[in-house]
Regions:
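Hydrophobic, aromatic-enriched alpha-helical segments typical of multi-pass transmembrane helices
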Residues: 1-238
Length: 238
């Protein structure tokens, strides 16, 4: 019984870390899958690239779906992990991340639909065949714009997670500071020109935060005794 109780928070932390690792890896693989296929301002070249590398394009979409599914798993596991610190804030963080996941899944349609249109899967009678590449490129241009929106919700999520990590006694406070800083950076997309300008720096900070948190959860986990102490204190307050 004691061993099971001790293993539970550590197992939750490591499952969260593994899910996060899968999320980061598949998200990066999806980016590389689409790289070089979309030519800005050239619908014909974009259509040619997509049709010539249709399997690669579909693989990128599959990676996006896996990334979203693993992110939902992270959401549930983070809620359980940080619930002893503050249940309401842990729920709020989960809420923000689920909204981000929903927006991300919606944005991926702007990768799938152009492939279907160009491949003739769904012929559009109201659009001439020579206009299809331009329509496909227009739809593809909406994906990064939608991405800017779900990044904002990830920003809110990371700010709350950063605070919870900092207030916890079972994880290093430095991870909390890093997560909050990454979240505040993501919130710069509330002013799109600023977010676009800062994107290279934000991406590096965001990736550093995710990798640091992921590796810590997988390799070290949490301080089980302190987690249980916070859990008992939370139960007493309730």
């Amino acid at each position: 019984m004691i061993r099971t109780a001790e293993a539970s928070p550590r197992l939750t932390a490591r499952l969260a870390g593994i899910s996060y690792l899968l999320n980061v890896m598949t998200a990066l693989l999806s980016v590389f899958s689409f790289r070089g296929l979309v030519v800005s301002g050239d619908p014909a070249a974009t259509a040619t690239n997509i049709l010539a590398h249709a399997s690669r394009f579909r693989l990128g979409f599959a990676f996006e779906i896996i990334a979203t599914a693993s992110s939902i798993a992270v959401t549930a596991l983070f809620y359980e992990l940080f619930k002893p610190v503050n249940r309401s804030l842990s729920l709020l963080a989960a809420f923000f991340r689920l909204i981000a996941c929903a927006l991300a899944a919606f944005s991926y349609l702007f990768h799938l639909v152009p492939l279907q249109i160009l491949g003739g899967t769904y012929p559009l009678r109201v659009v001439k065949s020579e206009e299809l590449p331009a329509l496909a490129l227009l739809l593809l241009s909406f994906q990064p714009r939608t991405m800017n929106i779900f990044i904002i919700f990830f920003g809110f999520h990371f700010v709350v997670i950063g605070y919870l990590t900092f207030r916890s006694t079972f994880l290093p406070r430095a991870l909390g500071v890093l997560a909050a800083f990454a979240g505040l950076g993501a919130l710069s997309f509330l002013a799109p020109p600023l977010g676009t300008y800062l994107f290279p720096y934000l991406a590096a900070t965001y990736l550093l935060c995710e990798v640091s948190l992921t590796l810590w959860l997988i390799i070290v986990g949490v301080d089980v005794q302190r987690w249980q102490e916070q859990a008992r204190a939370a139960a007493f307050r309730a």
